[in-house]
Amino acid sequence: MDTTVPTFSLAELQQGLHQDEFRRCLRDKGLFYLTDCGLTDTELKSAKDLVIDFFEHGSEAEKRAVTSPVPTMRRGFTGLESESTAQITNTGSYSDYSMCYSMGTADNLFPSGDFERIWTQYFDRQYTASRAVAREVLRATGTEPDGGVEAFLDCEPLLRFRYFPQVPEHRSAEEQPLRMAPHYDLSMVTLIQQTPCANGFVSLQAEVGGAFTDLPYRPDAVLVFCGAIATLVTGGQVKAPRHHVAAPRRDQIAGSSRTSSVFFLRPNADFTFSVPLARECGFDVSLDGETATFQDWIGGNYVNIRRTSKA
């Protein structure tokens, strides 16, 4: 199998071009780079600079003020090593070596008025782009969700900006190979705008053809992961690839910091799916019954998202 991660132009997909190649990519890989989608490095820089300044210079009181008191509520600031994807996926107990700022369509926690203005604009651009690419996924697979495409895409998205600082020696690859554990996304599509490590190390990797492959930064290109919801709503026509964030070796620690702006196009809480189909597709679903809602699934999946100790 060809393990190359392809690049598609959203504008060309919208013109009906490259449909056979796009369908093969959705079926076999479930990830691709996307250009011409209205998201560039310039928009990312404005939002990134603001949140990195808050991460580095915000006081403890300011950070507490925008930290959600509800562990499963993905809003506001989340401190370094406060979450564990490994715990969520039952693959270990190590923390995610990152800090995070999260926002959605409502109930947000903003550090300032300027932050709210810039981040709301950035969120809206991400939401527009994610819906546009999701339309192409649905069109390419001949999928018409219950209630229609536009109702399905008028949903409950989530934006999470992760800052992965330079790792300490005890989190180097020799000690702990991963900054974040392998997982698939509970989304229709996930859009990622990343910045590279200064030393050239590629941290983000995804499973392609049975092995994890590097997903480097590409200027003015967005990385798209199809999520488990895409698999389910298309009846299994779309792959939801596992991906993780690798740790650098000791000799790569210097210059290993990076950022990743991750936009999850998630369905509404009452989106209903087939539990047997989810299991058949390889998803870890412990719910009873023939059908379940997205809220049922995500509620159980993220019950352990916030770490309670450094153990």
Curated annotation (Swiss-Prot):
Organism: Streptomyces clavuligerus
Cofactor needs: Fe cation; L-ascorbate
Gene (name only): cefE
Known function: Catalyzes the step from penicillin N to deacetoxy-cephalosporin C.
Protein name: Deacetoxycephalosporin C synthase
Membrane-crossing residue ranges in chain numbering: none
UniProt-listed Enzyme Commission number(s): 1.14.20.1
Catalytic function, reaction form: penicillin N + 2-oxoglutarate + O2 = deacetoxycephalosporin C + succinate + CO2 + H2O
Example GO molecular function: iron ion binding
